[in-house]
Amino acid sequence: MKISKTQLTPAKCALDLGDGSERGLYVNQDYILRKLGRPHRGINIMYCYYPFDKEWPQRVSEACKDTNISFAWDYPYDDYFPYRGGIDGNHDGEPFTCMRDIRKHGQEVVLTLTCDPNVTDEQIEAIAKDLVPYGRMMLRLNHEATGDWFSFTKRASYKQVADFYVRFQRILKKIAPNVSMILCIGGLEPGSDKIEKEAEFAEAVKETDIWSVDQYLSLNWGWPYEVALKDNSKHKRSNTKEIYDGTKAAYKRFREINGGVNKQMLISEFNADGDVTGPFDQIATVKEFCEYIKADSENWLSGFTFYQFRDDGRLGLEITDPNNSDVGVEQPILGAYKEIMNDDFFKQGIEVKGDAELPVTLRWGSSEDSEGIAIDVDLEKNPVFAEAYFEGSLADANLMMEINGQWFYKAPGVKFVDFMPAFFDGKISEPKTVKLNIFAPPATGENDPSQGEDWLTNYYYEIKELPRLRFEFEPVM
């Protein structure tokens, strides 16, 4: 079989996906990959850290379940799942189980963490040490920081919140330089050319690695205590073009504050709320926004995070079955989102880099920068059987594979993968050679410090043999 060296390259606009928040539980990456057919650049998970509170480390909605609450953010601290790392933390629990799951499936961790701005340098250092093994991850600390709903904004002034961000960033960079920090704040003040709380957050804009805003084309922020109706007011729907233009204007102002020097710009939460629009206008407005991104020759937006995979309300590709939280009910937006994912503008590239010979050392840097191999597979027509068997040293390999536009995961210990789902919709009508692309993310989800000086940002795996392939084009009988 002919094999080639390959390289993963960034999308023009990366797609990340929210997976778990105050509005829904984390869904494992095997399920999401099977539903969507390809991985994301990153997966955003949301946690909180309020170690001085008497309710800590319980989830606050469970600790205060008998309290009369009429707004999602009225609890003593934010109702995300507790971050159980830090000083004397437990790395066998959350969020680390989720982080390892995400990375094993060839995606980057995007950790959103709301944090008491009064935590000590020692506590920040402990969190930074937690994040060292997880490669090129991103940390979105105290997002929507110019708002007034999260608990951290009620415990400090905006200047103190901004100064805390800078303090956290500087400590993190000394201990975990593999982690990029995302500053997520408001856009331009209405009627102004300055961003919200610009004086307070100017230094943070300069210090951070990545700029970000959150944008909902429509939103029922009264959920789950108020149903959005025509005669009540805790919901909104915005003009899609105005949201796009306003986000771009915020990016340009961030760049001006930074002395004209560019940085990545993200939308860290993006969707239209089906509670306001219903399922069909939700599709129309999301697709409209994506068309604005594609049509803009300035290519200023580095990526966005679709919020989220499974939601207890109507902000999900699936909504949670109220009878069983392990069950998701697919929404029409899921099919539309798959079309966006499969648009070349929004998916990473795979470039061929010349011939290869076994053994080959594969390098996993990130979903936008990794080296793999491709096996040429000659197809007479659409197969009836398309299989791979992983024997010998390959049995324990952790692999992400792509064929005919669809991705597959092989966990350590798995010896068989069925590729036929790649040919259910993408049928082959004439003889064709396709490539089976193989990459090797970290088998444990963590990088290995024994692998060399660049272990913080790269993971290596040597392939000594190829899988045994079975492609047949007629039924057995």
PLM features per residue range, with description:
Residues 169-196, 259-275, 301-311:
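Aromatic-lined carbohydrate-recognition surfaces of secreted/lumenal glycan-active proteins
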Residues 396-464:
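Beta-strand-rich ligand-recognition modules
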Residues 78, 216-276:
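Glycoside hydrolase catalytic-domain groove-lining segments
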Residues 358-360, 364-399, 434-438:
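A short beta-strand element within beta-rich, extracytoplasmic domains
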Residues 16-133, 285, 292-298, 309-312, ...:
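N-terminal carbohydrate-binding/catalytic regions of secreted carbohydrate-active enzymes
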Residues 2-32, 45-50, 138, 263-359, ...:
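Substrate-binding cleft of secreted/luminal carbohydrate-active enzymes
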Residues 45-48, 111, 198-241, 307-312:
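Aromatic- and acid-rich polysaccharide-binding/catalytic face
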Residues 128-158, 181-188:
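Active-site groove signature of glycoside hydrolases
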